[in-house]
Structures are given as C-alpha cells and as structure tokens.
Amino acid sequence: MRLDMPCVETAHLLLRPVEEGDVCDMFTYYSDPLVMRYLSLHPHTDIEETLNSIRSYFLTWEKRGVPQAWVIVHKHDDKVIGNLDIHTIDGDIGEIGYLMHPDYWNQGLMREAVSALVKAGFAHVGLRRMEAYVAVEHPASAAVLKHCGFVQEGILRKLALLSDGRYHDMVLMSILKEYILTESFRLDK
C-alpha cells in the first residue's frame, strides 16, 4: 500500500499534497460555518487554528498510516478552494472526506476531485473498497458520491456528533474496486 499521493491534474483542478503555505486559503473555508455544519469540527476562529490543523493532522499522514491529503486548487484562479483525503484506513478499506469553499459549490468541481481521489485510492494506494459517511441532512454531498459511483448501503442512526453539538443519522456510501472495472462505470461522466 502506497501512502504518498501524486499530484493529479483534472480539467479544472490541480490536486496536490497540503502544505503549510496553504493556510490562508484553507482558513477562508475552515472558518465558514456553512462549510463546517456537517462535520464534527467547529469553525476555526483564527488562522493559527488552521495552521495547527495542517501541522498536527495534514502533515502527519505517514505517522498516522494514511495517504497524504490533497488540497483542491482551482486552475482558473490558482486558489486553494478545498481539500479531500482518505483519512482512515482499515486493511484495504479507506474512508474519504472532503470540503470546499462555498463560492465553488454547484459547479461540478467536487465531483471532479472525488473522482480523481477514487482513481488514486484504487490504483495508487491499492484499496479494495472506499467508504464515506454523509449526514442525512446533506443530500448534495450524497449526490456527489452517487455521481462518482458510490452506492448507499444504509443509514446509521445517531452516529456522528457534528459541529452543532447534536448526534446525526449518517448515510453509509461505498464503492468497490471491482465496480470501476466494469464497462458501465466511467469516472469522467
């Protein structure tokens, strides 16, 4: 299993490992309550909090035994607009997570990024299965995953304590490596 992640270029995005120099752009979305509402993290209140997250979480991937996280760079304006990662590995199963600045929502950019992560997770990292948990109240995120080939497996009741301080039902979605080998599957659709 390879944990170093290559840089990947898509039609509109550059996906590359997180660096400390990304802190200003990352703070703009980590401090936004809209972005953080379906996550277990609270909005960041100052840039130091974001820098500490980069240092203690994103740059410790090797020690934690997970692949490097990517920032999502929008090629049109060369801004870091989000990040995504395979944040948990259990054998050959990886759990993914992602978030994006709201100015870039509803443009198909997260689908583009998640599709690239799925390809890298199976081809580069060597995973057999990838999973994501999505708050029931967040159908847009589930739609991103469905577009990328994930299927809903079920709903886990009151699974996650989110930033609002309440437990939420979460949809478990997954994709299998064998599925992407079928002719009916295309990540670039």
PLM features: residue spans?
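Acyl-donor (CoA/ACP) binding surface of acyl/acetyltransferases
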Residues: 1-25, 29-36, 71-189
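Hydrophobic residues in alpha-helical segments
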Residues: 30, 39, 61-62
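Conserved GNAT-fold acetyl-CoA-binding loop/helix
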Residues: 34-56, 68
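Juxtamembrane helix-loop transition sites at the ends of transmembrane segments
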Residues: 49, 55-58, 170, 175
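A short helix-loop-beta-strand connector motif used in the catalytic cores of GNAT acetyltransferases and
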Residues: 57-71
